[in-house]
Regions:
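Aromatic/hydrophobic pocket-lining residues that form the small-molecule binding cavity
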Residues: 13, 100, 136, 140, ...
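Metal-coordinating catalytic core of metallo-dependent amide/deamination hydrolases
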Residues: 43-216
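Metal-associated gating/positioning segment near the N- to mid-region
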Residues: 1-44, 63-70, 138, 162, ...
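Hydrophobic residues within beta-strands of alpha/beta enzymes
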Residues: 24, 28-29, 115, 175, ...
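A short acidic, glycine-rich active-site loop
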Residues: 1-12, 90-91, 216-227
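His/Asp/Glu-enriched, well-ordered alpha-helical/loop segment
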Residues: 149, 153, 213-216, 224-310
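C-terminal cap of metal-dependent C-N hydrolases
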Residues: 278-280, 297-339
Length: 339
């Protein structure tokens, strides 16, 4: 919150990074919020952490999903503390070709490895609607062009149908969420080679909760969750390339393996296919497959040794007690085998 000193927030973030590594996640793509200095500290080994690729900020149009200025004129407490440190988190709100190009360049200057933009509203705030489109196609194309100029790419928060279409027309590399896509969009994603990161744990959790207690959630929430689940299964069956990813702020840090279970439950993936979505495919999405993502000679030695069979029960990976060894870059972060 806005009353917490920045130094406290940094130490809290370091603890969250350790929890994520403790869960067996050796590399992450942080899609908004992590500044370059934090990544540098992790690289220097100042605290245990997954290696990071970072977007630094979430780029938004004025009044969009990543604009935290409230109608009252007050900045939302989520971001108020951050926005006082403009050298770490540059302005991330832009409009028009010139405006978004400048924001993109400033974001790369601040240390971003890629750009995260919002082409729709979201579901987390009462005044948002995922069906509202954000950024026109020409603005999206301008940011994609700027990313390409930096040898990078754009990931798009996109939930509603038209905003997903706009993001695809603009040339983004990955669609984050993609909840309300249709078959035409799925076909286009296959044709363009666009990745889908469905952040499926929330939907799966809601449907499980409904099965256990039918009265626990409103009917409109269940109906929406069923639609999202149906669309994800459709996308998988049509051959959309799916990379596993979580949604921080909705999921606790260190619970990443819940998304593996969700992919198996919602799409019909085998446990091995879900593991591939979290390793090889995720590294390809992040353009890091030459460094990690598979057990290949010459790549970084990241591996887990577990005391069970995740191919028989993928959910076992949610329990950290089952992780006997976590190796990151050839170094054992956790080793219960030789200790």
């Amino acid at each position: 919150d806005a009353l917490t000193p920045l130094t406290t927030r940094v130490l809290e973030a370091a603890d969250r990074a350790k929890r994520t590594l403790d869960a067996g996640v050796t590399s992450i793509r942080d899609i908004g919020g992590t500044p370059r200095g934090f990544k540098l500290a992790a690289q220097r080994g100042l605290f245990p952490s997954p290696r990071m690729n970072i977007a630094v900020s979430i780029i938004s149009q004025t009044g969009g999903h990543g604009d935290y200025a409230l109608p009252s004129g007050i900045t939302h407490p989520w971001m108020a503390a951050m926005l006082g440190y403009q050298t770490e988190w540059p302005n991330s709100v832009g409009d028009g070709i010139e405006g978004v190009t400048r924001v993109a360049r400033e974001t790369f200057r601040a240390g971003a490895d890629f750009l995260k933009i919002c082409t729709t509203g979201g579901l987390s705030l009462p005044d948002e609607d995922p069906n509202h489109t954000q950024f026109i196609v020409e603005e999206i194309k301008a940011m994609v062009a700027e990313a390409k100029a930096h040898g990078s790419y754009v990931a798009a928060h996109a939930q509603g149908l038209q905003g997903i279409k706009n993001a695809l027309e603009g040339g983004v590399r990955s669609i984050e969420h993609g909840y309300f896509m249709d078959e035409e969009v799925a076909d286009q994603m296959v044709a363009q080679g666009t990745y889908l990161v469905p952040t499926a744990h929330l939907t799966n959790g809601r449907l499980r909760r409904k099965a256990e207690d039918p009265a626990s959630l409103p009917e409109d929430v269940i109906a929406r969750s069923n639609t999202v689940a149906d669309n994800l299964k459709m996308a998988y069956e049509k051959g959309v390339t799916i990379a596993m990813g979580t949604d921080v702020g909705v999921a606790e840090h260190g619970t990443n393996a819940e998304d593996l279970t969700a992919l198996v439950d919602l799409t019909g993936m085998s446990p091995m296919q879900a593991i591939v979505a979290a390793t090889r495919t995720a590294s390809e999405c992040n353009r890091k497959d030459h460094e990690f993502g598979t057990l290949t000679v010459g790549k970084l030695a990241d591996l887990l040794i577990v005391d069970g069979d995740p191919l028989a029960d993928i959910s076992m990976l949610e329990n950290k007690a089952h992780l006997l060894m976590i190796m990151q870059g050839g170094n054992a972060h956790k080793d219960l085998i030789n200790s």
